[in-house]
Swiss-Prot record:
Matches recorded under PANTHER family: NAD KINASE
Keyword NADP: yes
Coiled coil: none
Reaction catalysis annotation: NAD(+) + ATP = ADP + NADP(+) + H(+)
Organism of provenance: Burkholderia mallei (strain ATCC 23344)
Cellular compartment(s): Cytoplasm
Family listed: Belongs to the NAD kinase family.
Keywords, alphabetical: ATP-binding, Cytoplasm, Kinase, NAD, NADP, Nucleotide-binding, Transferase
EC number: 2.7.1.23
Name recorded for this polypeptide: NAD kinase
Taxonomy, superkingdom: Bacteria
Length: 300
């Protein structure tokens, strides 16, 4: 068993527009408070579902006051909160109340048993990489954002191919005609990048993966770069091209705009139950080993 820091103040975050989220959040809050932890709610969550008298805090206030944030929802909820809390180095515990749940790895049915043990110090910790990106237009930055999974440059549904000029560390790599380009972290390698035939990167691998989306030339293949690479993507052709960050914020692009992407100085601490296995997560979520010749241990 790995014993880490024991927490005092615990922030609860839920996907507030999800039907049926109020009851499990209230149940978890009562369970945690009964064991002597101070419970606070993220403000939007509290407003949407009611916080039963618990303090309601903004993400910045959570970062300053809470020792850990427990997120009940899907991966999208975890991504959004991870970006907001990254500057404060607040650890996240993810409880899956969505569908796939690559990064919300605790089943909701187990949360009342597992979460109190983790808050008491029984957990495994890992750091996840973030990307930071900015859009440069006519030599001036016009937009800045963080991305936990990926930065995606792509065309709209009814326009032709995008034409992109890609450079790494100031060196020209290629011009590409495609539906777009994904720049993904190891965490994001199992998201949109995976569906575009990109490789899976272990979360502790120090790399950034570039994955073309439906490239015109089949020789345009995914490539894994060192995680200290500075990537520049210039729009040199095409109409209705945009960029999104974790599929949660979007910006329209113009001809000659450049998207500059690099590893962020921030990381996001994830806390997992003792015995957590990334490979078990892959087996379960990707349906590997569906018909095994022999059963393997979950922690293999």
């Amino acid at each position: 068993m790995k014993i880490g820091h024991q927490f005092h103040t615990v922030a609860l975050v839920g996907r507030s527009n999800t039907p049926g989220i109020a009851e499990p959040l209230a149940s978890l809050a009562a369970c945690i408070a009964k064991r002597g932890f101070e419970v606070v709610f993220e403000a939007d969550t509290a407003q949407a579902i009611g916080s039963a008298g618990y303090p309601a805090l903004t993400p910045a206030e959570i970062g300053a006051r809470a020792g850990v944030a427990v997120v009940l929802g899907g991966d999208g909820t975890m991504l959004g909160m991870g970006r907001q809390l990254a500057p404060y180095k607040t650890p996240l515990i993810g409880i899956n109340h969505g569908r796939l749940g690559f990064i919300t790895d605790i089943p909701a049915s187990d949360m009342r048993e597992v979460v109190p043990m983790m808050l008491a110090g029984s957990y495994e910790r890992e750091e996840r990489t973030l990307l930071e990106a900015r859009i440069v237009r006519n030599g001036e930055p016009i937009y800045h954002a963080l991305a936990f999974n990926d930065v995606v440059v792509n065309r709209s549904g009814f326009s032709g191919m995008a034409e992109l000029r890609v450079s790494v560390d100031g060196r020209f790599m290629y011009n590409q005609r495609s539906d777009g380009l994904i720049v993904a972290t190891p965490t994001g390698s199992t998201a949109y990048a995976l569906s575009s035939q990109g490789p899976i990167l272990h979360p502790q691998l120090q790399g950034i993966v570039l994955v073309p989306i439906a490239p015109h030339a089949l020789s345009n293949r995914p490539i894994v770069l060192p995680d200290d690479s500075k990537i520049a993507i210039q729009i040199i052709g095409g109409r209705d091209v945009n960029v999104n960050f974790d599929m949660q914020s979007f910006t329209a692009l113009e001809l000659n705009d450049t998207i500059e992407v690099r590893r962020s100085k921030h990381t996001v601490p994830f806390l997992h139950p003792v015995g957590y296995s990334y490979y078990a997560t892959l087996r379960k979520k990707l349906h590997w080993n569906e018909h095994p010749s022999s059963e393997e241990d979950d922690d293999a």
